[in-house]
From Swiss-Prot:
PROSITE patterns according to UniProt: PEPCK_ATP (PS00532)
Protein name: Phosphoenolpyruvate carboxykinase (ATP)
Cofactor: Mn(2+)
GO molecular function, one term: ATP binding
Keyword entries, A-Z: Acetylation, ATP-binding, Cytoplasm, Decarboxylase, Gluconeogenesis, Lyase, Manganese, Metal-binding, Nucleotide-binding
Residues annotated for Mn(2+) binding in this entry: 213, 232, 269
InterPro entries with a match to the protein in the record: PEP_carboxykinase_ATP (IPR001272), PEP_carboxykinase_C (IPR013035), PEP_carboxykinase_N (IPR008210), PEPCK_ATP_CS (IPR015994)
Cofactor binding note of this UniProt entry: Binds 1 Mn(2+) ion per subunit.
Binding site for ATP: 213, 232, 248-256, 297, 333, 449-450, 455
Enzyme class: lyase
Organism annotation: Shigella dysenteriae serotype 1 (strain Sd197)
One cellular component (GO) term of this entry: cytosol
């Protein structure tokens, strides 16, 4: 066996990292466990052992991604292809960075990593060998190496022997940029990408998700340009090989609804769809743990064991975890290798073409039906809208819904114009004869959330085909086709108007929501394709 798979300090010098005497290459889980619990570690490097066997770490002030500190080098590679924050009507996080400032940031990170004991993890992003990225992660922090080992696809010994990285991620979490003001950047922290050098730099933030979502943003750039759909969704497959994908923003039920004892999980967050079918980008899951209980979500709870890595949870002195405590952040998380879930697709997280495409929304306005069947144009319209709404409490106890529109149910991670993702998705759907549905997991006129029991019955009706055979009627204003009845679902809730004391109450709320949809979609009307889709949306 070659030491470090033949990776030498000289090879790191090619990236600008010098004077490295100790490389820990693709460490085993056992070694990472020892490293994280090393009593000499201080600050955010230190791990704490919990009673479930998993190590817990803190990520400091950054307990989520830092979208305002995200930059992409604008050069000949990206100038005409990237969806830039400073061009067009759409708002996004893709702020341009000059090649000169990139060189300065790269100097800061390589200086931070030089002369240190480094962890180097080689892994794949993408379960399809033809289109996967071979990524090399370089960090001085053991638990960050653990995080990427959990989240990305772990190569076999044979694959490692011939590993040539397509992309380099240098994580300099301990360094910051003192010249940020002169360079007109957002802050001293940075998450920067260079598509020509094929490199990501991280400075100032310890949050592990920057590495996960950074590579997702890169797949979101590279794949659609090859005609492959790149999707922020979960996916599962039934006994007959029938594949379903679930799009949805945070809190709409992506993970919960795709974790189904009757079906095998392909993945819970990031997927591609190519000529062979749907494939996972990842080798692990990154689940929210706030208010987690063994009773409500046994699969996730049972996945928290040795080799899982908890982030920002409260660990009591006896090692037990207070999952209800959100004092550090509501965004408490756990990463674990996908095989910690029993019911998964093996040995590779991929399956055939999807025939059911489900858009999940949690409508706090109480306007949208629990389920509707979409036309091809409505599919594009609702995909580009990416709507959900949260209930935000105010001090007087009045709860006003807050709408969120996030293009393609993942605007934060898009690298190309949203219409490009919609076009690729629709092409894939048409070729596979796939049907799309809009499922509201939120509220209705009763003021209560639609029950998980009803939602699961709706998903079953979609997946077993009974919804496609049901009689439908059209909901006015939104022109959505709603089934008149479904097995196992309370018929009264299918028409949202029936859940109000009077139809006028629904009408009033519907007008408010319809206007929000129309105003949001205006940003897509600067292209002929976008303008043509306006008719598929609500009409006042």
């Amino acid at each position: 066996m070659r030491v470090n798979n033949g990776l030498t300090p000289q090879e790191l010098e090619a990236y600008g990292i010098s004077d490295v005497h100790d490389i820990v290459y693709n460490p085993s889980y056992d070694l990472l466990y020892q490293e994280e619990l090393d009593p000499s570690l201080t600050g955010y490097e230190r791990g704490v052992l919990t009673n479930l066997g998993a190590v817990a770490v803190d990520t400091g002030i950054f307990t989520g991604r830092s979208p305002k500190d995200k930059y992409i080098v604008r050069d000949d590679t990206t100038r005409d292809t990237f969806w830039w924050a400073d061009k067009g009507k759409g708002k996004n996080d893709n702020k341009p960075l000059s090649p000169e400032t990139w060189q300065h940031l790269k100097g800061l990170v390589t200086k931070q990593l030089s002369g240190k004991r480094l962890f180097v993890v080689d892994a794949f992003c993408g379960a399809n060998p033809d289109t996967r990225l071979s990524v090399r992660f370089i960090t001085e922090v053991a638990w960050q190496a653990h995080f990427v080992k959990n989240m990305f696809i772990r190569p076999s010994d044979e694959e490692l022997a011939g590993f040539k990285p397509d992309f380099i991620v240098m994580n300099g979490a301990k360094c910051t940029n003192p010249q940020w003001k002169e360079q007109r950047l957002n802050s001293e922290n940075f998450v920067a990408f260079n598509l020509t050098e094929r490199m990501q730099l991280i400075g100032g933030t310890w949050y592990g998700g920057e590495m996960k979502k950074g590579m997702f943003s890169m797949m979101n750039y590279l794949l659609p340009l090859k005609g492959i759909a790149s999707m922020h969704c979960s996916a599962n497959v039934g006994e007959k090989g029938d594949v379903a994908v679930f799009f949805g923003l945070s809190g709409t039920g992506k993970t919960t609804l795709s974790t189904d004892p009757k079906r095998r999980l392909i993945g819970d967050d990031e997927h591609g769809w190519d000529d062979d079918g749907v494939f996972n980008f990842e080798g692990g899951c990154y689940a929210k743990t706030i208010k987690l209980s063994k009773e409500a979500e046994p699969e996730i709870y049972n996945a928290i064991r040795r080799d899982a890595l908890l982030e920002n949870v409260t660990v009591r002195e006896d090692g037990t975890i207070d999952f209800d405590d959100g004092s550090k952040t509501e965004n408490t998380r756990v990463s674990y290798p996908i095989y910690h879930i029993d019911n998964i697709v093996k040995p590779v997280s991929k399956a055939g073409h999807a025939t059911k495409v489900i858009f999940l929304t949690a409508d706090a306005f109480g306007v949208l039906p629990p389920v509707s069947r979409l036309t091809a144009d409505q599919t594009q319209y609702h995909f580009l809208s990416g709507f959900t709404a949260k209930l935000a409490g105010t001090e007087r106890g009045i709860t006003e819904p807050t709408p969120t529109f996030s293009a393609c149910f993942g605007a934060a991670f898009l690298s190309l114009h949203p219409t490009q993702y919609a076009e690729v998705l629709v092409k894939r759907m048409q070729a596979a004869g796939a049907q799309a549905y809009l499922v509201n997991t939120g509220w209705n006129g009763t003021g209560k959330r639609i029950s998980i029991k009803d939602t699961r019955a709706i998903i079953d009706a979609i997946l077993n085909g009974s919804l496609d055979n049901a009689e439908t009627f059209t909901l006015p204003m939104f022109n959505l086709a709603i089934p008149t009845e479904l097995p196992g679902v309370d018929t009264k809730i299918l028409d949202p108007r029936n859940t109000y004391a009077s139809p006028e109450q629904w009408q009033e709320k519907a007008e408010t929501l319809a206007k929000l949809f129309i105003d949001n979609f205006d940003k897509y009307t600067d292209t002929p394709a976008g303008a043509a889709l306006v008719a598929a949306g609500p009409k006042l």
